[in-house]
From Swiss-Prot:
GO biological process: mitochondrial proton-transporting ATP synthase complex assembly
Gene Ontology annotations for the cellular component aspect, listed alphabetically: mitochondrial inner membrane
Organism for this UniProt entry: Eremothecium gossypii (strain ATCC 10895 / CBS 109.51 / FGSC 9923 / NRRL Y-1056)
Keywords: Membrane, Mitochondrion, Mitochondrion inner membrane
Location in or out of the cell: Mitochondrion inner membrane
Name of the featured protein: Mitochondrial ATPase complex subunit ATP10
Family membership noted in the UniProt record: Belongs to the ATP10 family.
Listed Pfam families: ATP-synt_10
């Protein structure tokens, strides 16, 4: 018994826990600063059905000082941006947690939309990238009713409501409801009948219900999709690259900028 106790009671704390404790102790919510998006957002590699975004360290990584330090910093950032932080930021900014870029990003610099799998309003399972590929799309992303309402304001343009009149929209519209938990996922699916009555039938196969957990915290941050309460609008080109992005409610000039960017990307694609 003495030997057993001796082997299990080392005095040194495992490296990963030391790094984590230090980082968490220094983590404190910082005042959110609204800034304009300038650098392209997205993933470095195109999405595929086999893509999985992993967060955390393997057992071997726990013995690497560099990897444990990086993971500790990630955990500290996630800890500092809790649901309460998201709610406070949303109230302060009215959902405009960042300002959109003044124009669309050039194709050679743009980054990719992530892989997301889910169920559409038709009841079929599928990957979002399969619907996006080959077309210029305007993608609406939200996790709650408030966020959906804000993002929907970008689709009211020139006397039309493109979400109600899908046949007049200048580009393909794709909607993604990111459910925060299995309970919310179940509730959204329970309401699928009501959603089908609100969304034009032609767009049912382009309305996805996806689990938010597919995108770990660090991935959501790199995509600027971190705030749970606001809504997002993205312009995605036929090669699945994010060319423009906005969040929160749209003023008239914001909606005009969105559809101006859509036309610009469409002209660019037609010229290739």
């Amino acid at each position: 018994m003495v030997i057993w106790r001796r082997y299990l009671s080392g005095t040194a704390q495992p490296l990963v826990f030391k790094k984590m404790n230090k980082a968490l102790a220094q983590a404190a919510p910082r005042e959110h600063v609204v800034r304009r998006l300038e650098q392209p957002v997205g993933m470095p590699q195109p999405p595929t059905a086999a893509t999985r975004y992993v967060e955390g360290n393997s057992m071997l990584d726990m013995f690497s000082e560099e990897k444990t330090s990086r993971r500790a910093a990630e955990l500290a950032a996630e800890f500092s941006k809790s649901g309460l932080y998201d709610a406070a930021t949303f109230r302060k900014t009215n959902g405009r947690v960042f300002l959109p870029p003044a124009s669309y990003w050039r194709a050679e610099h743009a980054r990719y939309f992530p892989h997301l799998g889910g169920r559409t309003l038709t009841g079929a399972r599928g990957s979002v990238e399969d619907v996006l590929a080959g077309k210029v799309s305007v993608v609406k992303v939200f996790s709650c009713e408030t966020g959906e309402g804000l993002a929907s304001s970008y689709f009211r343009h020139e006397g039309h409501d493109y979400l109600r009149e899908d046949d007049v929209a200048p580009a393909q519209i794709v909607e993604i409801s990111l459910t925060e938990s299995w309970i919310k996922d179940w509730l959204v699916r329970l309401m699928a009948g009501r959603l089908r009555s609100l969304v034009p039938a032609a767009r049912h196969e382009r309305y996805f219900i996806c689990r938010r957990a597919q995108l770990p915290f660090t991935v959501r941050e790199s995509l600027e999709l971190g705030n749970l309460y606001t809504g997002y609008v993205l312009v995605v080109d036929p090669q699945l690259k994010i060319r423009w992005m906005a969040c929160g409610g749209a003023e008239k000039r914001d909606a005009e900028l969105l559809w101006k960017c859509v036309r610009g990307v469409q002209r660019e694609c037609a010229a290739v």
